Amino acid sequence: MNENKPKTNHRLKLGLISLISMALAFVLYPTYSAYKTAQNEYNEMLRLQEEAYNQIVEDEYITLDGLPTIHVIPGNSLKIGDVQKYMDLFVRTQPDVILSNCRMIHICEPKNFMDIAIADGVDVTAGGQGTAYAYASSDDFSITLQIDVDEDYGQKSAVSHELSHIFDFACGSGYGDYGISDGAQLQSLYKNYTDCVGAYGATDSAEFFAQAGAMYVNDPENLKSVCMDLYNFMDSLYHLY
C-alpha cells in the first residue's frame, strides 16, 4: 500500500538547520575577523622586529645603558640586533667588579678580527695554544671582541678573561703595567700551580691570572677542585660567592 508521507517535518528540519547555520556564522564572524586582525597585527610586529634587528649599525660609537662605550671598528658591517644580543648574552652578564674597569669595547665582524688583531700587534696564536678570540689593551683599558651570536664557544668566558686583564691593569702602577699578576702572592701561586688552569694559563702569570678570573666567574666549583688556594685568592679580589 502506498502512503503519501508528509514532507513538512523534513522541510522544517532543513529550515532549522539553515537558520542555525546562519546564526552561527553571524555570531562567529566577528570572532574570526578579530582573530585574523590580531594575526595580521602580530605578523606585522614580527616583520618590524626583524627589520629593526637586521638594520646595520651606522654610528661608529654606541652607548648602551650600563655598558662602557662601544666602538664599531671602521670597515665592519654589524647588525644592530646582533650587537645588542651579544652584549646582553656575554657582556651584561659579567660581574661589575671587572666590567667597571673597562672604558671601551671595540667590536668587529669575525671575518675581520685576525687582521685587526695583527695590526694591533696581538699574538693571534694565543701563545701557541690556539687562536685568539679577543684581547685587552692597557693603553686605553679596552677590550676588542668579534661579534658572533650564532655559536657559543665560550664567548662569555673569553670576555671574563679579557676583563680580568683590565682588572689586572687597573691594579698596576700605571698604564702598560700589570698589578696583581706581578705581585708576590700571584707569582707564588703561578709557580706552584702553573698548569692548574690549563695550557694557555701556564704561558705567563698574566694569562694565569686572567684564566683564573674567567674560571672563578663562570665555573667556580671547577676552580675549587683544581686549586682551592687559587680560588680563595680570586675570591679575595672579586668577592662573588
Q: Model segments located where?
A:
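Short, hydrophobic/aliphatic alpha-helical segments
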Residues: 2-4, 196
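Active-site-flanking segments in enzyme catalytic domains
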Residues: 68-80, 99-241
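A metal-dependent hydrolase signature that marks the N-terminal structural subdomain at the beginning
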Residues: 2, 9-18, 26-135, 139-141
